Amino acid sequence: FMRCAHYQDMEGWPDYWLGFPPLMHPTHAVAPCLMLLGKRPETVYCKGSGRVRKEVEAPYGCPYAFESALISLKDSDVSIEMARFLYHVARGYTESFNIYGERKSFEWQQLESEQPVLFSMALGANAEHVMNDYGRGGLVTEERIQIPDYADRLPAEIGRFTKQTVYDDSNPHLSFLQGGGHGGSHPHLVHEFVRSILEDRTPVPSDIDGAYWTGVGICAHQSAMDGGVVKRVPVFE
């Protein structure tokens, strides 16, 4: 099972964001889950929650403060829970994903100043569960982990941009003020795209990947507006 979210208060952003439906642009949340699984979303259903004020609802006609969806995948028994809000929720910024497996699970940090948590199921010599001290339930350990920077995988000329940017206190940009520079991903994306052109191959992520990442959110929002009706995600190949 996987869970992903993008929480961000958009008050004061440019007018084109005013009232934007939460899951119409879900890529910051769902992309890591779909990329890690290597699967395509097949169906999705979604419910809206809470109401925004009238002037926020007016531009796009979306009344919901929060949208949460459940995604089924083609040729997979894994489901993904996806959630996003943009207005009227008292919660700090995060772009996060959690992964729950039989032997290990990963949870994004609750606060951006913290580190993520890795949970591990203790296993015996024959891969059997080691029981906890009470004899009920397996023994699970947890540890805070440091995610590597991976700047060493980039040319030196752009590797520094995983942590530094062309923006500073005198020249800020909102994606860094609230988005933390998207985790240092910008130079990795640029490098991969340029290399794909030089090597005459499809980049990772591809245009088709992007269509699914965006399309599943559009379908989710349509589901919410229709009261939670299951929507089938189009095939983009």
Model-derived regions: residue spans:
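Non-catalytic, hydrophobic alpha-helical segments
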Residues: 190, 210-213
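C-terminal glycine/acidic-rich active-site capping loop/insertion
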Residues: 53, 57, 62, 70-75, ...
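Core catalytic loop region at the nicotinamide-binding pocket of NAD(P)H-dependent oxidoreductases
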Residues: 80, 201-205, 226-232
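Rossmann-like dinucleotide-binding domain that binds NAD(P)(H)
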Residues: 7-94, 98, 112, 208-211
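C-terminal capping/lid region of NAD(P)-dependent oxidoreductase domains
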Residues: 1, 222-237
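Short hydrophobic/aromatic-rich beta-strand segments that constitute the beta-sheet cores
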Residues: 80-82, 106-109, 223
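Short, hydrophobic alpha-helical segments
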Residues: 37, 190-201, 218-225
